[in-house]
From Swiss-Prot:
Tetramer of two alpha and two beta subunits. Signal peptide: none annotated. It comes from the Bacteria. One of its GO terms (molecular function) is arginine-tRNA ligase activity. Belongs to the class-II aminoacyl-tRNA synthetase family. Keywords: Aminoacyl-tRNA synthetase, ATP-binding, Cytoplasm, Ligase, Nucleotide-binding, Protein biosynthesis. The lineage of its organism: Bacteria, Pseudomonadati, Pseudomonadota, Alphaproteobacteria, Hyphomicrobiales. This is Glycine--tRNA ligase beta subunit. One of its GO terms (biological process) is glycyl-tRNA aminoacylation. PANTHER family: GLYCINE--TRNA LIGASE, CHLOROPLASTIC_MITOCHONDRIAL 2, GLYCYL-TRNA SYNTHETASE. GO terms for cellular component: cytosol. Its main location: cytoplasm. It comes from Sinorhizobium medicae (strain WSM419). The gene is glyS. It catalyses: tRNA(Gly) + glycine + ATP = glycyl-tRNA(Gly) + AMP + diphosphate.
């Protein structure tokens, strides 16, 4: 079967857009082909800085004929109805229609319509111009003389050529001709911009990839990443060093080169006095270079690794020299930031009021930056006040949390006040991703305790599902306060995540709270925390506080479900223990854990079956309005199975309640498991719907006791199986 090759070659595409753009091309083209009636065996996308490529294998040469039956009016319908049917069906005469009989509706006309298939070349030529014109680039531009013409092509960078060939594996391929803004599809591409700029005639993908490889273009981005990684590790090893891995940078650099050549540069060792994080970010952000270190060392070496797109005749000496000059200049700036951040700010007398508000020591650089942050009234959010106001809220909430975490109150207060101070440092101004990290370093330099310094860095954590979770009580208190203030604040102003939109990363903040609580085994009722946070916000409409708390707790429940499911918990078991007002997340998780162990055991499965049977019978009778006794009357028992079940429920309920009071949910489940045999015996020996109304009502009340007993730990009706 034929293969289709498409290449869209342009000037340099931003690295961050390449992977998605290639995926978009694949989806748009394959969707259009399938919609037009073509099928294919496989498709794969490729990309380089200058081209998007699509290789489709086993594409049908022609779409199949389509047959359709279109129902028309009855044969005795008026002329107007018949004429409308003929027009809609594309028939020239009613004699071309068929007559079908329906026993109920009588005879009616049916048109048998055949839509002839189309050649694949025709379909491709038909769909490609619109795909290119409407391509979903996040940013695009017009170029050339046609750019002034309304409706002219927009592309991420000027589009230069289009390749579109089609043909079976052992046959000659054809060019599928179509045109977009004067660019005509052909079988001609071009190699590396500098090493092989000549035209190259290609047929199908294998031929295309081979010829581009000879023209110093590695078409496969994953292969470019492998080359860069292997060569970088090798050159580092050869110099007695190891590469500091950076997957994000590797992805970006692979999108900057078509023919990767790995080189090593260096800078003066004196710059190693700058924190490693600043060195790494300076070199990464400005020069897209990797850093190295001695094997097993924490600190960096003065060697960096760069990736060139050119195979230089001098072995890359000039490239290394040029990059080294820029790296040194950037590190010189970084050293300046680092030094200035440790010095005094000017006009300290203007910061006295802010210093007094937060108990700051203006002899210390980090305290000065916090005072400056407050004095400048830097906005956190238009509806949530300034950064200074936010720090005051975090301090208040962290103080309340310290009573629960057992953290030292003075350390918590100090860490909360300094947590955002590094936002006014020059290092964080240059590299925002260093917030917290630089605060920790400056805190250590000015003599803060380890607990305070660590909390300044760790209060942003965890920032994702795999990030480190702080365990020190001071860090946990400030981290929880920071995230809860954010969540309560944005809920209070009705800025909540919707669908895929979460501009303030509130889902991540909620996950952070969940991980801090569960992984730290913290008993932290959320609703009182919401109350403290809401009180600090000074809402204009206090009545809305209850709505905010309820909605936010429901949001936490949703995120907790996702988190527990990711850990392997069953969704129905989570639902079974999750009451609407449950705000102790650790207790919810422990109940799910205990219920999971119980339900997977034979006793649990059998009790579940019996409990669900009891619940279903009771629910059905309640729905019909059947009388259910308010309480069980032992005098109405007629069978030993009734007496045994009643006595067993009392013992199991007492045992379960006592275990729950001790927060021993496994023992609570074990207590309930003793109901299995009495429940089985009851349903084997007892007819619930007895003819005597009083006995029936009493037996239904007994079923209600089963439901109530198991309901102490979970709503068994929500458990599947």
């Amino acid at each position: 079967m034929p293969d289709l090759l498409i290449e869209l070659r342009s000037e340099e595409i931003p690295a961050r857009m390449q992977r998605k753009a290639a995926g978009d091309l694949k989806k748009l083209v394959t969707d259009a082909l399938v919609e037009a009636g073509l099928t294919y065996e496989g498709a794969r996308e490729y990309w380089t800085p200058r081209r998007l490529t699509l290789d489709i294998r086993g594409l049908n040469a022609r779409s199949a004929d389509m047959r359709e039956e279109r129902k028309g009016p009855r044969i005795d319908a008026n002329d107007k109805a018949i004429e409308g049917f003929l027009r809609a069906a594309g028939l020239s005469s009613i004699s071309e229609a068929h007559v079908h009989n329906d026993p109920k509706k009588g005879d009616f006309y049916v048109a048998h319509i055949v839509r002839r298939g189309r050649e694949a070349e025709e379909i491709v030529a038909d769909v490609m111009p619109a795909i290119i014109r409407d391509f979903p680039w996040p940013k695009s531009m017009r170029s050339g003389a046609a750019s002034a013409i309304p409706g002219s092509l927009r592309w991420v960078r000027p589009l230069q050529s289009i390749v579109c060939t089609f043909g079976a594996e052992h046959d000659e391929t054809k060019v599928i001709p179509f045109e977009v803004d004067g660019i005509v599809a052909s079988n001609i591409t071009y190699g590396h911009r500098f090493h092989a700029p000549e035209a190259i005639a290609v047929r199908r993908f294998a031929d295309y990839a081979e010829k581009l490889g000879k023209a110093k273009v590695v078409i496969d981005a994953e292969r470019r990443k492998e080359i860069i990684s292997a060569d970088a590790h090798n050159i580092a090893f050869a110099n007695g060093l190891e590469l500091v891995e950076d997957e994000g940078l590797l992805e970006e650099v692979a999108g900057l080169v078509e023919w990767p050549k790995v080189l090593m540069g260096s800078f003066e060792e004196s710059y190693l006095a700058i924190p490693s994080e600043i060195i790494r970010l300076t070199i990464k952000t400005n020069q897209k270079c990797f850093v190295t270190r001695k094997p097993g060392a924490e600190t960096l070496s003065n060697r960096f690794i760069l990736v060139s797109n050119i195979e230089a005749k001098d072995g890359g000496k000039e490239i290394v020299h040029g990059n080294g000059k820029v790296v040194r200049a950037r590190l010189s700036d970084a050293a300046h930031f680092w030094k200035r951040d440790q010095g005094d700010l000017p006009d300290l007398e203007t910061l006295a009021a802010s210093a007094g508000k937060f108990g700051l020591d203006l002899k210390k650089p980090l305290d000065q930056r916090m005072a400056k942050l407050d004095a400048l009234n830097v906005t956190f959010h238009a509806k949530l006040g300034t950064q200074g106001e936010r720090v005051a809220r975090i301090r208040s909430l962290a103080a309340a949390l310290a009573k629960i975490t057992g953290a030292d109150p003075a350390s918590v207060a100090r860490a909360a006040v300094l947590a955002k101070a590094d936002l006014r440092t020059e290092a964080v101004g240059e590299f925002p991703e260093l917030q917290g990290i630089m605060g920790h370093k400056y805190a250590v330099l000015q003599g803060e305790s380890a607990a305070v310094a660590n909390a300044i860095e760790d209060h942003y954590k965890p920032q994702g599902p795999s990030d480190h979770v702080p365990t020190d009580p001071v860090s946990v208190s400030v981290a929880l306060a920071d995230k809860l203030d954010t969540l309560v604040g944005f809920w209070a102003i009705d800025e909540r995540p919707t669908g895929s939109k979460d501009p303030y990363a509130l889902r991540r903040a909620a996950l952070g709270v969940i991980r801090l609580i569960l992984e730290g085994r913290a008993r932290l009722p959320l609703l009182p925390c919401f109350d403290v946070a809401l009180a600090s916000l000074k809402l204009q409409r206090p009545a809305m506080a209850a709505d905010v708390s309820g909605d936010l707790l429901a949001f936490f429940h949703d995120r907790l479900k996702v988190y527990l499911r990711d850990l392997g918990a069953r969704h129905d078991l989570i639902d079974a223990v999750l009451a609407p007002d449950a705000d102790d997340l650790l207790m919810i998780a422990r109940r799910v854990e205990a219920l999971t162990a119980f339900i997977t055991a034979e006793e649990g499965r059998n009790l579940l079956a019996g409990t669900k049977r009891a619940t279903q019978i009771l629910a059905a009778e309640e729905k019909k309005g059947t009388e259910v006794a308010a309480s069980v009357d032992e005098e109405l028992f007629r069978l030993d199975a009734e007496r045994l079940l009643y006595a067993s429920i009392k013992v199991a309920s007492d045992g379960a309640r006592a275990a729950i009071a001790k927060e021993d949910f496994r023992s609570a489940m074990e207590a309930l498991s003793k109901l299995r045999e009495p429940v089985d015996a009851f349903f084997n020996d007892v007819l619930v719907n007895d003819e005597d109304k009083a006995i029936r009502a009493n037996r239904l009340a007994l079923l209600g006791l089963i439901r109530s007993a198991t309901g102490e730990v979970a709503d068994f009706s929500k458990i599947s199986g």
